[in-house]
Structures are given as structure tokens and as C-alpha cells.
């Protein structure tokens, strides 16, 4: 586990380097920070060459608008379009078990995937 704090472009570059060596990487972020701040790194370093060797799973919380009250920077309103533009499959799990399944599947495959999460409802709080 590597925590780069609010250095989204750097964590994507680290993920690209690890994936290029065959590693399986999960990049977690809140709202649109990873996608918006590091889009060029995702485009060039993940899609450009790292996806062919390893696995990168982007997990992004806040898809249901639970962070919107924190301001424009926390809005996640066009993430699906950004991922589609890069031909990155989008997964939108409805509960914890579906999320776990998507992550396990992603770790077994080479390539990139994007999982968007919402946290502020009873389905996500319920432990299975």
C-alpha cells in the first residue's frame, strides 16, 4: 500500500510503473480528484503502455453525490464520459458483494477498469 496523499498524478504514475512490471494495482480516490487531476497520466501512462502488462483498477467514491456539498471540486458528474473516451470499462456496483466481485475479477485480468462507488446509503453500510 502506497499513500501519496493529495498527489493524484504521482499515484497514477506509480501505478503505471507497477502495472508495467506485471503488478496488480488498485488506485482509490474520492470524488473526481484522481480522474480529473491525473487524466493525462491515465491517458498516456496507463492506457498508453501499462495496461498491457498488469492490472490497474481505479476505485472512486462519491458517484452518488455524497460529497457535492463540499464544493465543485467534489462533483463527479462526467467521470463516465472521461472513462468512455479512453475505452476504460466502467463498473457501478449496487452493493458490497458486487463491489468485491468486480475487484476480484479485475485482479485476475490484465487491463484497466473503473469502479465508481456511493457510500451514503444503508446498502453500503450493511456488512455481509
Name each model feature, range by range:
Residues 7, 17-128:
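Conserved thiamine diphosphate
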Residues 1-3:
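Short pre-catalytic strand/loop immediately N-terminal to key active-site residues, enriched for Gly-Thr
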Residues 6-8, 12:
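Glycine-rich oxoanion-binding loops at beta->alpha junctions
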